[in-house]
Amino acid sequence: MAAMETETAPLTLESLPTDPLLLILSFLDYRDLINCCYVSRRLSQLSSHDPLWRRHCKKYWLISEEEKTQKNQCWKSLFIDTYSDVGRYIDHYAAIKKAWDDLKKYLEPRCPRMVLSLKEGAREEDLDAVEAQIGCKLPDDYRCSYRIHNGQKLVVPGLLGSMALSNHYRSEDLLDVDTAAGGFQQRQGLKYCLPLTFCIHTGLSQYIAVEAAEGRNKNEVFYQCPDQMARNPAAIDMFIIGATFTDWFTSYVKNVVSGGFPIIRDQIFRYVHDPECVATTGDITVSVSTSFLPELSSVHPPHYFFTYRIRIEMSKDALPEKACQLDSRYWRITNAKGDVEEVQGPGVVGEFPIISPGRVYEYTSCTTFSTTSGYMEGYYTFHFLYFKDKIFNVAIPRFHMACPTFRVSIARLEMGPDEYEEMEEEEEEEEEEDEDDDSADMDESDEDDEEERRRRVFDVPIRRRRCSRLF
């Protein structure tokens, strides 16, 4: 009878051998592993088995074997100590920490000054004080990032990328939390928005909405864009850059460390290159990368400003007699409505570069569209240096430009039909007055219009408005 009772006794978790139990425990998350400590003495002992905590230390805190050796602690102690420090950010820490580690590793040999400009992480009490100052809670992923690095010193070049034209320069620094708090917005149009970046040259900032207000989603990151057609200063449109701080920061880092954003003169330039945007004619290859400039763009009126960087390279295996010089360019420019403009002119940016085997020539130019997207394509005309009478064309691949997703100001959406009609009438009257003023000197006006058109597409940057500083 006793033998039968032994054979039919139910198999419990407690009765399992140690190895199978440890295997089962290895599949548990850290929360369940901690809960097992309160079930029984045996499970408590097994849940403290140090190798079980190795996976969690690596998964949540990215702690390496080298760090463990340096700290001379067991895995469980490391997990508990780190959790006691940044445990509230456990859902964000790994993604944010990896992005920071990847970014610094990539930039150290390329932009050492930029890495040296990074500040030490902020303390919890510092972040709490900022929340008390602005009267709003900071997003947890934002706090997590600032525990690792509290922004950077306000220096050039900025960590969040640069852009340079002949008469325009932008370089965005990542603000420390105290400086950001000083620029926290309470005014209509940007209510409850905290600046993330700042450019000392243009006053441009990227903002994060710490509360949902005025049509913005909470935690959304955007460039502000004043509505120049509205009389209400609270009418501010937005170019959306990220759904959350994590989305914004990690996507930027990915573009940098993948080589998507080129490093030029120790600066990160925010040009996007489509790998398919390359054309080869004979021994010459032309590739294009583009960038949208929010500080020179507007939704109302529709004016979208883009810059592009073109690389012209001759194969190093080309014969010496293939050396040639660029004579002219031809552009076919198409906007989103299908309207086409054709332009041709001598050289590029006032130069007539010579291309020889292995040589690379790069230049930057810009264009604008009245639609949210468009594309350009065309060709260069070259002549051989050794056979000057022989000319040939080199294809420029079609490259597309599109502005980011934007959201129209709620102030405009809430505008009454009478008010909107009155505003349009005033704008039409202003345009008519401008036309009357210009009619006295029509010939000069025609020349100016032609110059404006040529400057727009003839590789000469246009001087536009600069965003005013907001703090």
From Swiss-Prot:
Pathway where it operates: Protein modification; protein ubiquitination
UniProtKB keywords: Host-virus interaction, Nucleus, Ubl conjugation pathway
Feature: compositional bias, Acidic residues: 419-451
UniProt xrefs under Gene3D superfamilies: 1.20.1280.50, ApaG domain, SMI1/KNR4-like
Ranges where the ApaG domain occurs: 278-408
Any GO MF annotation of the entry: ubiquitin-like ligase-substrate adaptor activity
A biological process from GO: SCF-dependent proteasomal ubiquitin-dependent protein catabolic process
Subcellular location(s) per record: Nucleus
InterPro entries to which the protein is assigned, alphabetical: ApaG_domain, ApaG_sf, F-box-like_dom_sf, F-box_dom, F-box_SCF_Substrate_Recog, Knr4/Smi1-like_dom, Knr4/Smi1-like_sf
Region feature Disordered, mapped onto this chain: 419-455
Main location class: nucleus
The F-box domain, residue ranges: 10-56
Quaternary structure annotation from Swiss-Prot or TrEMBL: Part of a SCF (SKP1-cullin-F-box) protein ligase complex SCF(FBXO3) consisting of FBXO3, SKP1, CUL1 and RBX1. Interacts with PML, interaction is direct and takes place either alone or within the SCF complex.
NCBIfam families for the chain: PRK05461.1
Function: Substrate recognition component of the SCF (SKP1-CUL1-F-box protein)-type E3 ubiquitin ligase complex, SCF(FBXO3), which mediates the ubiquitination and subsequent proteasomal degradation of target proteins. Mediates the ubiquitination of HIPK2 and probably that of EP300, leading to rapid degradation by the proteasome. In the presence of PML, HIPK2 ubiquitination still occurs, but degradation is prevented. PML, HIPK2 and FBXO3 may act synergically to activate p53/TP53-dependent transactivation. (Microbial infection) Associates with the Rift valley fever virus NSs to form a remodeled E3 ligase that triggers efficient proteasomal degradation of targeted proteins. The filamentous E3 ligase targets the TFIIH complex leading to robust inhibition of antiviral immunity and enhances viral pathogenesis.
Protein name: F-box only protein 3
Organism annotation: Homo sapiens
